[in-house]
Amino acid sequence: MTGVGTFWRTVRHLKPAQVLARLRFRLHKPRPDLRPAPARQALIGPWVQPAARDASLVGPGRLLFLNLERDLNACGWDDPQIEKLWRYNLHYFDDLNAVGSAERAGIQRVLLDRWLRDNPPASGTGWEPYPVSLRIVNWVKWLLGGAPARDAWRHSLAVQARWLSLRLEWHLLGNHLFVNAKALVFAGLYFQGTEAQQWLQTGLAIIDRQLAEQVLADGAQFERSPMYHALALEDLLDLLNIGQALAPAGSVVLTLLPNWRETAGRMLFWLRCMAHPDGGIGFFNDAAHGIAPSNAEIERYAAQLGVRALVPMQEGITPLMASGYVRVARGPAVALLDTAPIGPDYLPGHAHADTLSFELSLGIQRVVVNGGTSCYGLSAQRLLERGTAAHNTVQVAGQDSSEVWSGFRVGRRARPGKLLVDGWAVSCSHDGYRHLPGAPVHSRRWQFEDGGLLVQDVVAPSVAKTVARYHFAPGLTVRATGAGAWSVMAGDKPLAHVTVQTGQASLMPSRHAPQFGVVQSAQCLVVNLTDGRATTHWRWGTHAHSLSV
């Protein structure tokens, strides 16, 4: 059971408006408005093919979400025994715009008609605001892409938009409120008339305020998850797309397009900075492959919409000061460093206790990776994946650097100190263990050099049972080559050599979750700090060879 202290440390960061909105959301139960749908707006400009995901409708009535396939005849639309996130995905209709969608048009129409029959307005998970928002957008995209529009589908779209306009998630804010607003903009542009204009005005007003708050100066989405950042960028690109396609002359939407395009460019730069050379996102906070479109697909979509962005330096250090991340590229190495706060104080639901963690690639091979995310909800696995031990950083006295609990809650939060960049050295500290006796502070310094990286950790004052962890990517083999020395191999190819210069180290089994529903075996180097200090030296290329012979 959660203690009073943890609960207070969690709720005291909420905005008063969130608390009031939650009460209003629970108490106010509007009735669905079943009036006929407004007329449809004709296309004015070109409609660009949106970013596509992998297919999720894998056969008639067979759906694949989160790497788990089910038959709709067996599971139904809202089985409470099935994970909530899987049920949410069931109601999104992402497959309408997925890879190879046209080949499944027949079974897609059957599924859509079945949804209308089995999910009456305002009933069940499918009518919660978040799935309603994503479904409105997906249906409109599909129809704008040329799918024949049936009257029943258009009518349901209008009913959903009316319902959503009364169920906006002001109590959650963040990405939920943004996609609520995006859906209203989509409905407001797809339909004509006074009612549609009201949806449009409501959506645009929210987006105007939230875009300024949620996109930081360096382009990061403020929850600081590369996965949710990619989703937010997709949202903004979708708004650009429908604005160009449906906004009539004189519409206020046309005046917003330049700002949306500039903001999307900054967001694309941040996404590029937080990607590994293999093209995929880094695993910071809640992050997994297969939820957002691939970075390559987002790049394609952005280019077709005329979005331009800077390219990260091929050689050098790129501090993303507003969000708190650092990209380092030197020789074959690319490192992503986390010196960031865990997220907005009032919205830390997707945060992990990963402060001062990092990831490392050599060429297109990931070498050091954080633990990833395989699940949401309330489970020991969820807590494990959010905890400090699943990340490449220091854990003090068995505690988490930020007090993660439940599925999406955080009590005490680590606060990073000043980020310092000196030549090829990056250093920072945090106070996430300030509640322990002596209020210990963890400081970390990354010193990059030709063919190597020196990681120095200090915890002062020193505390017993303090360890640094380095989680190796699945598929790599790590073997001891001497006292305090290990060789890292990809198959029979040597990648790197690791020497623990200060501290007592051992190799332990580990787990990595690159996608929801996927957990892979891996290895982890665990370094026990000596007198509050650990120094770990990583070498690669010819430098690694000279150390390992």
What are these regions (language model features)?
Residues 10, 22, 34, 313-396, ...:
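Beta-strand-rich N-terminal accessory domains
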Residues 1-73:
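Extreme N-terminal leader/anchor segments
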